[in-house]
Amino acid sequence: MEFIKGYFSRNKKLILISLAILLVFFFIGAIVSNVLVGENQGMISRMMIETNKSINFSDITVDAMSLFTHNLFVDLMVFIAGILFSIISVIIVIFNAISIGAPFGSDFYFASVSILPHFFFEYVGGSVFALTGAFLITKLEITAIKKRSIKESLSDPYVLKDILFTLILMVIFLLVAAIIESYVTPMITLMAFGK
């Protein structure tokens, strides 16, 4: 328990920076989408309601394992790209944040029903911890460059533990997100738009 408190204390700034990047570009995606969609605001919801007789639970369910695997692959790319000074990591998170913000700007009701149930776990949890992990790797890399020694950069007893714990948190959040997205989100979507 002491380690967990220390982890959040040691890495608070990196977690907040990661969260800020995600949220700023999420809102940019939502605002730009809202402006671009114009009078077609809410069109997806209208189309879903019009075709509600043909929507079944099996039509909108997705295998939790395939969702988890896909999201894990993307977030592992973000995490590992910390080796490249987190530049690629930040670009991927920005792209994902804009992409996930866009549906909220173009059709808030549809996005609230189909994305919001798993949003916290997949994006606020998974993506934020993936980017935090990338920043921790970059921080380790910069320390190694400054000290001109990998061994000396590992002298802090928490460096590798923090990276590993961040990875574990990311995986846990993505696993919960996949379960919610696979089993809960389709039920909510069906209740909102189905029979």
Say what each PLM segment does.
Residues F8-Q41:
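N-terminal signal-anchor transmembrane alpha helix
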Residues I21-N34, F121-V128, M170-F173:
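Hydrophobic alpha-helical membrane-insertion segments
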Residues S54-F85:
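Interfacial helix-start motif at the membrane-water boundary
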Residues T138-K195:
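Terminal transmembrane helical module of multi-pass membrane proteins
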Residues P117-L140, T166-L169:
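Alpha-helical transmembrane segments of helical membrane proteins, especially in multi-pass transport
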Residues I31-G38, F79-S106:
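Transmembrane alpha-helix/helix-exit interface in multi-pass inner-membrane proteins
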Residues M1-L14, F73-V74, S149-K161:
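Cytosolic juxtamembrane amphipathic/interface segments immediately preceding
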Residues I31-K53, I188:
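Interfacial/capping segments of alpha-helical transmembrane domains
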